[in-house]
Every structure is written in C-alpha cells, then in structure tokens.
C-alpha cells in the first residue's frame, strides 16, 4: 500500500479530503514496497510539468504516430452537435448505438444518455451470493433469538417502568430497581450502537484501503519503470475524486454487491473519457498512451487534434463546452459513475426469484422441480435470452455455446488448451471481465469507448408510439443523414417485407396483423401443414416486426424539415422529380445489450483467431486479459505498404461510403476542409486506416444472424 501520514486522524471532516491515493502532499515522492518494481532504487522520476498549462499545438508531447485512427462522417457529426446543444437524448441515443459518439463529445453526451437509460430508470443488479447468505443467516439468527426468549425486552425509554406502574403490586423499591434497570439497558444499547459503529467504520476503512490499493495498481501499470514516482496536484485531486465516488457507491449499494476491484476499474476507465475535475480537459491516459514524462493525465483533445483542426471553429466550440458550459451538462463524476455501473452491471431479475417473491408460501419441492425444469429447457432459454438478457452465469454458458457453434476451430483449440474449462481469479477471469464488466480493464480504451457508446445508446421502441412521434423527437432529421446511420446492427431476417408494408405508419397493431397474415400465407413461416410452430421463427418475427418504424415521406418534406443548413443543402441538391422517396426508417434496439456484447466478444475473438492458435494456454490468457487495440497507427516501417493499400482503396471506393473510405489529399483538405463527407484524424503520412472496432461491431451483427439462421434450420 502507499504510505500514509502518521499524523493523519480518522475524523469524518478530514476523511473526505484525505481519501486519496496517498495522504502525502502533491509532488511528494511516493514509494510502494509491494507494488513497485525495485523499492531500494533511488531513481527519481523527472518533474511533472504543471498539468493546468494549456497544451500548445506545436509543442504537444503526443506524436502523430501515437494518435488513434479515427474517421467520422461530417453530417453525422453536425447532427450530433445539434442534438447535444438541445439535449435531445433520443437523437444522441440513436447516433450512439448506430455510429458511436465522437470521442471528443463523450464527456457531455454520456451524462445525457445515462440519465435517460432504461437500466438507470429501472435498475437491477444481480446480488452477490455471499451477501444473500449473510442477510439470510442474520435474519434467521434474529428470529431465533427473538423466539427463544420467553420475556421480550423493549428498548424504549421508560417501558419497564411503565409496566411496573400498571402492575398494582408495584412499590417504590420496585420503581427504583426498574429505573436502574432502564438505565442499564440504555447504557447497554449505547454500547451496542458504539460497537456497531466501530465495526462499520472498520469495514469502511478496509474497503477504502482496497480502493487505494487498486488505484495504486493502475499507477504502477503506467509508471512500471519507476520505483519512485511523483503525483502532481491535479493527478492527486483526480484520484481523490475517483476514490470518493467508488466509496460512496459502495456504501449506497453495499447491501446488494460487495466491493470488488471491478468497481475501481470502471471508475478508472470512465475517467479516461470523462474529466473528473469539472471544467477541465484532463482525463486518465489509459494503458495505450506513451508519454515521455509518464504523466497519469492528458488533455483529451490532444488525441484528436488532427480531426479538430480539419473542421473550422470546432476547437473553439469544444473549449466553450469544457470551460464555460452551464446548460448542457454539469453532472458530477460521482453521479455519472453510479449510473454507468448500473448500466454495465445490470441484469434482469431471475424468473425463479420473481416467482419465489410472489409465491412465498409455495413448498420447497415445487421450487426444486421448477429449477430442474428450467435447467432442462435450455432450448427455450436460447429463444428468450436475446431479448430479455440473463445472469452472468447464463451469459457465460451462452457465450461458450455460441463459440462452439460459430467458431468451431477456435473453440476446439480452446478446448485442447483448457481455456474455458475452469474459472477463478487466476484462471479464465478474462471472460468475466469481457462479459460481466463489459471490457473494463482488459480492452483498449478506444475499443471500449465505442462499445460503451453502443450500450449507452441502447433503447427499445415503445409500441404505443408511432412514427410521427419519434420523427418529431429526432427534430425531423434529414433522410440522407438518417440513411447514413443504417439499420440496427443486430437486425434479423424478414425486414425487407416489413420495409414495404405500406405508406401508412407502422404501429404495433399493424405489425401484429401483418405478422398474422404472413404466417398464414407462409411468406415468413412455412408451416407446410405442420401444426408445430418454430420457436426461433417466432423470435425472428418478433424481432423483425418491432425492429424499426418507417414511413414514406416526400423528398421536399424531408429536405425542408431539417434544421441543419448543411444537410438541407445536400438534400435539396440530391432531390429528384419523383414526389415520393423510399421509406425513412428509424432503427431501434431489439437484442439485449449484454447479449449483443456476447457477439461483439465473439467477433473480437474471431479477429484474433490467427494469433490465438499460435499461443499456448498461459499466453492466451495473458493476451485476452490485455487485449491490444488496432486503433493506433501501424509502425512507420509499414507506412509505404499502407500508402499503396490506401491509394488502391481510394480508386475502388465510392463517395457515399463512410466506412473504410480513403481520405483525400491533405492539400485539398486545407483548401476545402468541409467539402469531404468523412473527416479523418490520420496524419499526412498515414492517410488510410480501417475503423477496427466499427468493423468488429458490424461482424458481430453478422455472427448474430448466422447463429439465428443455424438455430432456425436445426429447429426445423
């Protein structure tokens, strides 16, 4: 543990400020005998520059080679700015799940998305089994102690004395003895209260020490080459804010989940995108960042300076958001952190637990038979899990099942290497970090940020709302811009027939009628005289019918309805003589976000398959526990080959493809910086870079449809 000051007291007034990574003053050399590499070394790190100094464009310590590759459609970016300025959570959620939030806007968008997220409005976290056992045993002990005593005692003042007065045989001596007894009871109650308070303080102090130790591990990861290191004033303040946020969450939700290092890692990963100190641009650097002075913090605008400089007035807009915003979002780090944990750790309430709470009087034999029946009907669970989600145990089982089905070669190799045969702190904990904690700690911050965008933007369609309601909520977004967002990533078969269902609004009743007609005519479900219906076809129909809502809209109406001048000009220039255009579709989420995360994880494994089959058991676990990112540029030695690939891709790509499109030359960008559809963060020497994590998410949708189709075939 990091050393603490000997003179520090445990008073409540000083604990809030001293609750930091170390009680040593800022810029003091801190040494950790357990965590640091060489405690006896006298190596002193170079002095850390004042982090509050504005970063100069020409004097930045971040080289171009360390900047993440990032491309983003300009029309979608402007639409995101419009929704952000108006706090339109409907539009921001749509962009987040379809294309991701621009990283430079996440610090303002994420709080808005979290405030309206369904898992924050109706939270449920799977309780820890140990805490459930403790609460059950405590209740049983309290009930046994109360029933075992023949004379129930009341702790209310004067209760025993009042009982003596009611008794006609009471005398003065009895009253004196009763008063003494009452005083003894009060003293005993005070002692019990003090004992409980001390025990609670000891528990909280232990939790706080664990938080400090986990924060120290993060520092040691970044400053591994130094046995002694300095913590600047700003770094000290950030770590203190993180510690207090984690501690307050643990105190609030401690009866449901106990403290785990994952809570600290969620806070650390959030602080890589959301500045903990209000009105500052300083975030944690993350494990990929390479800095000459090895500072813990960085200005989050530095990574995307190339992108920012390609858009006029964007830097001034971002600086206003950082330093002067009082309207869009002023939520604190602690509140954002609590809501983020509720989303990442959310799970649906188990059916067995709901039945148990509803029918507490049912006998134990019936409950056991229901549990055995649920365990035997895994086929039914496969048809409900994609929509409802499940516990972490169910998701792990589902992941292994899908891995064997979709990536059999890698699954066989994992079986041979015994990768998925045992779980524990030192075994296959990587899978728990992937699925339960949503990539916390083990994924790259750039990949994790995009996936968290997807999860925070997850929204279901309200079947009681029609197209006009949502189209109005989106501020009548331009059709061309809406088309760039594309369909839901996890769309399923049968959407084509739904797209041309008619000119009227598609509501829930119309969907149900269309589904019935299609089922009876055999267009979607071919019964072929068989009375037995396909459960997976039912799942497909249910997902397809509520996947999106659409409406045929005239070109003139769409072109004039948008509030963005740039998108209006584009729509008017592309209008044709026809009065009607194809359907305007608004995609909605249908697959549970944690189930979608399973297919994203499978897609990540598939992309690393060639590497994994060359590694042994230990190397695989280590690799998957610190999954490298492809968001950074290739090495300079590959730049020549990459240029040739970029030019070839540029010749074959179309101007309407935002994904994988090669940017144009730098000189043209400097003359007409806003004429491009896609703005890139790449430097001049390395122009083309595939958006790795976007391709991973798209491939996850393909794996989802492949799994669904294979299950439908087997179900027949």
Curated annotation (Swiss-Prot):
Basic residues composition-biased segments? 635-644
What organism does the UniProt record list as the source?
Candida albicans (strain SC5314 / ATCC MYA-2876) (Yeast)
Cytoplasm in keyword set: yes
> What residue spans carry the Low complexity bias annotation?
1-25, 132-168, 503-514, 559-581, 645-657
Record's protein name: Oxidant-induced cell-cycle arrest protein 5
Spell out the Basic and acidic residues composition-biased ranges.
Answer: 191-205
The positions making up the signal sequence are none
UniProt lists the family membership as follows:
Belongs to the OCA5 family.
| One GO cellular component, as annotated | cytoplasm
Which InterPro entries does the annotation name?
Rab-GAP-TBC_dom (IPR000195), Rab-GAP_TBC_sf (IPR035969)
């Amino acid at each position: 543990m990091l050393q603490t000051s000997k003179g520090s007291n445990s008073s409540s007034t000083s604990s809030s400020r001293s609750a930091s990574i170390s009680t040593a003053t800022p810029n003091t050399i801190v040494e950790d005998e357990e965590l640091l590499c060489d405690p006896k070394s006298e190596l002193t790190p170079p002095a850390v520059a004042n982090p509050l100094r504005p970063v100069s464009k020409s004097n930045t310590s971040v080289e171009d080679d360390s900047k993440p590759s990032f491309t983003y459609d300009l029309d979608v970016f402007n639409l995101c700015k419009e929704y952000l300025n108006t706090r339109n959570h409907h539009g921001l959620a749509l962009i987040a799940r379809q294309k991701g939030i621009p990283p430079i806007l996440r610090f303002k968008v994420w709080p808005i998305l979290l405030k309206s997220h369904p898992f924050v409005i109706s939270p449920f976290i799977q309780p820890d089994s140990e805490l459930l056992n403790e609460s059950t045993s405590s209740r049983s002990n309290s009930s046994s102690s109360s029933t075992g005593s023949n004379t129930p005692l009341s702790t209310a003042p004067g209760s025993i004395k009042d009982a003596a007065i009611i008794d006609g045989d009471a005398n003065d001596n009895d009253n004196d003895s009763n008063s003494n007894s009452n005083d003894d009871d009060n003293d005993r109650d005070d002692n019990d209260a003090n004992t409980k308070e001390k025990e609670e303080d000891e528990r909280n102090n232990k939790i706080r020490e664990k938080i400090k130790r986990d924060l120290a591990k993060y520092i040691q990861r970044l400053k591994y080459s130094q046995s002694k290191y300095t913590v600047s004033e700003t770094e000290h303040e950030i770590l203190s804010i993180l510690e207090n946020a984690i501690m307050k969450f643990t105190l609030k939700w401690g009866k449901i989940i106990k403290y785990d290092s994952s809570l600290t890692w969620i806070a650390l990963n959030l602080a890589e995108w959301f500045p903990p100190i209000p009105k500052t641009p300083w975030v944690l650097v993350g494990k990929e960042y390479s800095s000459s002075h090895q500072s813990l913090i960085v200005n989050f605008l530095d990574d995307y300076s190339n992108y920012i400089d390609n858009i006029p007035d964007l830097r001034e807009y971002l600086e206003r958001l950082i330093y002067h915003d009082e309207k869009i979002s002023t939520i604190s780090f602690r509140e954002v952190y609590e809501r983020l944990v509720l989303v990442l750790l959310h799970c649906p309430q188990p059916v067995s637990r709901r039945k148990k709470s509803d029918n507490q009087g049912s006998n134990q034999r019936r409950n056991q038979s229901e549990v055995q029946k649920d365990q035997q009907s895994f086929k039914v669970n496969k048809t409900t899990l994609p929509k409802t989600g499940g516990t972490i145990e169910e998701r792990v089982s589902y992941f292994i099942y899908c891995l064997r089905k979709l990536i059999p070669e890698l699954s066989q190799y994992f079986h041979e290497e015994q990768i998925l045969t045992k779980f524990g702190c030192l075994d296959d904990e990587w899978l728990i970090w992937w699925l339960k904690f949503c990539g916390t700690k083990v994924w790259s911050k750039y990949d994790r940020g995009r996936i968290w965008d997807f999860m925070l933007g997850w929204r279901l369609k309200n079947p009681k709302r029609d197209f006009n309601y949502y189209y109005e909520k989106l501020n009548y977004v331009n059709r061309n811009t809406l088309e760039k967002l594309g369909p839901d990533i996890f769309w399923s078969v049968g959407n084509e027939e739904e797209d041309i269902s008619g000119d009227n609004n598609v509501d829930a009743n119309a969907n149900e009628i269309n589904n019935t007609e299609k089922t009876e005519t055999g267009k979607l479900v071919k019964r072929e005289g068989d009375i037995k219906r396909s459960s997976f076809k039912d799942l497909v129909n249910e997902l397809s019918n509520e996947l999106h809502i659409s409406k045929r809209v005239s070109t003139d109406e769409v072109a004039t309805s948008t509030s963005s001048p740039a998108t209006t000009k584009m729509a008017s220039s592309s209008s044709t003589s026809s009065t009607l255009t194809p359907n305007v579709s608004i995609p909605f989420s249908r697959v549970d976000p944690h189930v979608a995360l399973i297919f994203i994880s499978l897609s990540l494994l598939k992309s690393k398959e060639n590497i994994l089959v060359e590694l042994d058991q230990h190397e695989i676990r280590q690799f998957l526990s610190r999954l490298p990112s492809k968001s950074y540029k290739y090495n300079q030695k590959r730049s020549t080959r990459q240029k040739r690939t970029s030019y070839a891709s540029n010749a074959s790509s179309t101007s309407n493809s935002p994904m994988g499109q090669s940017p144009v030359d730098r000189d043209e960008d400097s003359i007409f910086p806003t004429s491009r559809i896609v703005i890139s963060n790449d430097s001049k020497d390395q122009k083309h870079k595939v958006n790795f994590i976007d391709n991973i998410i798209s491939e996850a949708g393909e794996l989802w449809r492949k799994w669904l189709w294979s299950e439908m075939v087997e179900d027949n």
